[in-house]
Structures are given as C-alpha cells and as structure tokens.
Amino acid sequence: MNKTKMDSKVLDSILMKMLKTVDGSKDEVFQIGEQSRQQYEQLVEELKQIKQQVYEVIELGDKLEVQTRHARNRLSEVSRNFHRFSEEEIRNAYEKAHKLQVELTMIQQREKQLRERRDDLERRLLGLQEIIERSESLVSQITVVLNYLNQDLREVGLLLADAQAKQDFGLRIIEAQEEERKRVSREIHDGPAQMLANVMMRSELIERIFRDRGAEDGFQEIKNLRQNVRNALYEVRRIIYDLRPMALDDLGLIPTLRKYLYTTEEYNGKVKIHFQCIGETEDQRLAPQFEVALFRLAQEAVSNALKHSESEEITVKVEITKDFVILMIKDNGKGFDLKEAKEKKNKSFGLLGMKERVDLLEGTMTIDSKIGLGTFIMIKVPLSL
C-alpha cells in the first residue's frame, strides 16, 4: 500500500515537472512570436517609408535626367561655338553640366540603395511571417498537450468503455476549444486590434497635420479617426455576439437567428442570405438546450459556406412541428466530395463537430454536396429529448 502511494507521488512529481517544462516552452515560443510580430509591424512601417522614398527619388531622378540632358546640350552648343561665348559662360555651362551629372549619379545610387533595402525588408517580412505562423501553431499544439495532461478525464472514462474512444473524445474537445480560442484571437487581432493600432498611429499625426496643413485638414482627420473607432466598436460587438448572442436568452431562436443572418449578410456584403421560418410565431420558445444547439448548428453551417463554398447565395430554413425541429441550410457554391471529406477528418472538423452536436440531441444530419452544384444540409431534431 505504502509502495503504491510512493509510486503515485513519484508519478505526480514527474508529471508536474513535465508540465512545468512544457509550460515554460510554451511561454518561450509565445515570446518569440510576440517579438517577431513587433519586429514585423516595425518593418512594415519602415517598408512603407522606404517605398515612399523610392517614389520620391525616382521622381527627382527623372527631373534631374531632364535637367542634365539640357545642360549637356547647352555645353555641347557652347563647345561647338566657343568663339561666340565668353570664358565665364563656357565655365558656367561646364560647371552646371558637371554638377547636375554628379547629382544625378548620387540620386541613382540612392535609388539603388533604397531598392535593395526595400527588397531586403520584403524578404525579412516573409521570414518573420513564417516564424509568427509557426509560433502560433506551436503554442496552439503545446496548449492542447497541456490541457490534455491537466484535464481529468476519469468521469468521462466511466461513460466511455473503449480507451481509444476516450482519448479521441478528450482530444477532440480540447482541439475544439483551442480552435475557438484561435478563431477569437485571430478575429480580435485582425479586427479591433489592427483598427486601434491604426487609430493610435493616426492620432500621432494629428498635431503635425494641424501644424503643416491647417485646422480644416486636422478636423477632417479627427472625423476619420472617430469613424475608425466606431468600426472597431462594431467589430468588438460582432465578436461578442458570435461568442454568445444575448438576444438568444431574451428573444429566442427565431428572432436571434434572423438578426444574426441579417448582420452576417451586411458584414460580408457579397453574399445574399435568405431566411425562412415555417410553423412558428415570432415569440415561440423552445427549451434552452435546443435553442443554443440549433443556433450554433446554423451558425457553423453558414460560417462553413462563407469560408469554403465561394457561394453567392445561402438559404436558411427552419421548420417547427409538434415533434421535430428541422433546420435546412443550402448554398450555391462550389460544393465538395463527401467521400474525400470523410477520409480527411482533420479538414472536415466543422462538419464533425456539427454531427456530434446533432447526436447529443438524438437527431439526424444529412449532407448532400456535389462539386460545382453547392451543398445542402438538413438537420432533424426531436423535441421529446
């Protein structure tokens, strides 16, 4: 008995050391990614300045070429007819031609240096982008490992007899959590974070605009900044809404789904989304677990269509009967090969998650998709769960 306790303590100690090492590695990878991201943003700003300088130098070089050509023509004319010009006029023509030629040579050298610097920055940005993507992927993978090592799956193990099934189930839950966290993180970084960074940069220019270009341009820049802040606020609200629509608790499935689809259509712009509801009233309510599950299923299906199908139209239909709720999502996109998608499970994770959610509700999900003919998904859930 004592030996068993001792073995358990030794194993716990080994596990804790391993977790600490893995967690430390995760922090180091994260720091590398953050440093690379900061350097990337600095280089992007420097690249913008270099490109502007290249443009200005090319413009100046073109002007100097014209002036140099005129000066050489003038010098040639003076040389051919030197008896008609004074010594001072000849000297001035020569000095001007020489000075312009020197300036042109220097500006051409400057252009060459700037172009080389621009090319070098673009190569470094590509390298940094690769480091950032790899660090994000590594952090995500390490987090999955940490969560799996930390998570107690004993209770789930009582429900799952097969050890392999238990492992797959646990990993799938953790991967789903990490995918969602990555999605939210990416949306915040690419949306509000970028917008606010832009606001910060532009706010630093306002004083210079007031000083150099006057109050009218300065006030216009403030107005533009205000619009940027509004856009950032809209993005934050949209992300919050995607995480958990508060209207779902207050209004129910149908009004919330209608609002979500309207907002999604407005946000994406190019895709037309139609919504139809059969056999319901606006204030009809379902049990909370049905409302949340059906909303998430519709959200996932629409999100998949927007990301992958390249469709121009999406139709969402909800039919509520006495015993069932039927959810149908159809798009006119490029479709996909169902057999191939099932074989590549890592590439059909969204559909796999939808299938598992439907199974929990004891429902059925059928998918009909053909390449070039779009996709049709029908989900049928019994209300007697």
Swiss-Prot record:
What Gene Ontology terms describe what this protein does at the molecular function level?
ATP binding; phosphoprotein phosphatase activity; phosphorelay sensor kinase activity; protein dimerization activity; protein kinase activity
The alphabetical list of record keywords is: ATP-binding, Coiled coil, Cytoplasm, Hydrolase, Kinase, Nucleotide-binding, Phosphoprotein, Protein phosphatase, Transferase, Two-component regulatory system
Cite the Pfam families for this sequence.
DegS, HATPase_c, HisKA_3
Q: Recount the PTM note.
A: Autophosphorylated. Phosphorylated in vitro at Ser-76 by the serine/threonine-protein kinase YbdM, which stimulates the phosphate transfer to DegU.
Q: Which residues carry this modification: Phosphoserine?
A: 76
- What EC number(s) has UniProt assigned to this enzyme? 2.7.13.3, 3.1.3.-
* This protein's name: Signal transduction histidine-protein kinase/phosphatase DegS
Origin species, per record, is: Bacillus subtilis (strain 168)
User: Which gene is annotated as encoding this protein in its UniProt record?
Assistant: degS
